[in-house]
Regions:
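Short, charge-rich amphipathic segments
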Residues: 32, 38-42, 74-85, 126-139, ...
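Conserved PLP-enzyme active-site core in the AAT-like
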Residues: 1-119, 153-154
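Helix N-terminus capping/helix-initiation residues
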Residues: 18, 55, 138, 173-175, ...
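Conserved C-terminal alpha-helix-loop-beta "cap" of PLP-dependent enzymes
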Residues: 143-196
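Structural motif of enzymes handling amino- and sulfur-group chemistry
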Residues: 88, 96-97, 104-155, 168-169, ...
């Protein structure tokens, strides 16, 4: 099994084995090759101006027999674990006695089904999935939102604080894209010690 670093980062002198090489090694030794993508996305996030994250389709094309990923986070659905891959291995998982304890309830299946239907129209994903919409917002758009709310904040905190809009870089969060930063804007609130 290979685990994609979707919600953590390893820094320093590290290396990772290419998935195609691992898949070949597993085939040579008759071992199934599973990749856990963690946060998971079904689309190329670069199309929305976001950093690349591997998709299940890319991972299977690289030779993985099974791919696991989250139904929430980048996918935008309910909290769930999803397994895709070779049918014979999926059948073995279905026969496992633990499957009953880990299966999805009907409400989660309905919610996941509704989100998966959204992916049939990729051009509407940004407007349909709040997480992708938030991640794909341009810094200028976020700055405009800051401009709309800065006066009420300034009025509320009074003269004891200085309130201003600043440029910043935001973390994606939600167990996705560690160490990846997106250009953004923020409201900085700092105390005015001289006015106290």
């Amino acid at each position: 099994m290979k685990v994609h670093t979707s919600n953590y980062a390893i820094e320093g002198f590290t290396a990772a084995v290419d998935e195609k090489k691992l898949a070949q090694l597993c085939r040579e030794n008759r071992i199934s090759f599973t990749v856990d993508l963690g946060s998971g996305t079904l689309v190329n996030l670069e199309e929305f101006g976001l950093p690349h994250e591997p998709t299940p389709a890319e991972t299977i094309a690289a030779g993985a027999d099974l791919v696991t990923f989250s139904g929430d986070k980048l996918l935008g659905g309910p909290q769930a674990g999803i397994i895709v891959g070779k049918q014979d291995l999926i059948k073995k998982i279905r026969r496992n006695p633990m499957k009953r304890a880990l299966r999805l309830d009907k409400m989660t299946i309905a919610a996941l089904s509704a989100v998966m239907d959204l992916y049939r129209q990729p051009e509407k994903l940004i407007s349909s999935i709040p997480g992708l919409r938030a991640l794909s917002r341009k810094p200028e758009e976020i700055n405009q939102t800051c401009k709309k709310i800065i006066k009420p904040i300034s009025d509320w905190v009074g003269n004891s604080f200085s309130v201003q809009i600043i440029e910043c870089e935001s973390q994606v969060g939600s167990g996705s894209m560690p160490n990846r930063r997106l250009k953004s804007a923020a409201i900085s609130i700092t105390p005015n010690f001289s006015k106290r």
